[in-house]
Amino acid sequence: MTDNTPNAEPRYRARFYFDPNSIGMADRDSHYLLYGYDSVANPILRLEIRYSKGNYQLRAAARNDSNGWTNSAWTTIGDAPHFIELDWRAASIAGANDGSLAFWIDGAQVASSSGIDNDTRRIDTIQLGAVAEIDAGTRGTYYFDAFESRRVSYIGP
């Protein structure tokens, strides 16, 4: 799914339901489920899934102005539907370093990163699905539902 409705957004919130549906992945295989792109198709927001020691795990990340990534910790999810929400915010001005990324799974905040120097970043397009770096050992079908995005307010389940 591609969402072209964002328009150089300094803040972007997205919520959707995700079910791994027993997708086959080799241990430590990972790929990206969501990318948020700027106006020239550089990814600046991402959500990654991996399979580790028999568990599915998710982590979110925001790109800074030096092209580095601020990653959340990996959070284990069960093989069932989950409600996922992300709140990405660009820094307010150059030098403020007050950009942030918050991440919820099933209504519980699992990560919050702040102090990100990303004042030059803006969200222009979102892709949701198996968007990048799918390993050869990954096979099957997972499910997404009820995607919603906003500029500011919490969306919830």
Regions found by a protein language model. Name each.
Residues 2-14, 26-27, 73-82, 138, ...:
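Extracellular/lumenal carbohydrate-interaction signature centered on repeated Trp-anchored short motifs
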Residues 11-19, 81-89, 102-104, 143-150:
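Residues within well-ordered beta-strands of beta-sheet-rich folds
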Residues 83-115:
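Carbohydrate-binding surfaces in secreted/extracellular proteins
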Residues 96-104, 134-146, 154-156:
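Extracellular carbohydrate recognition
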Residues 113-145:
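Flexible glycan-contacting loops in extracellular carbohydrate-active proteins
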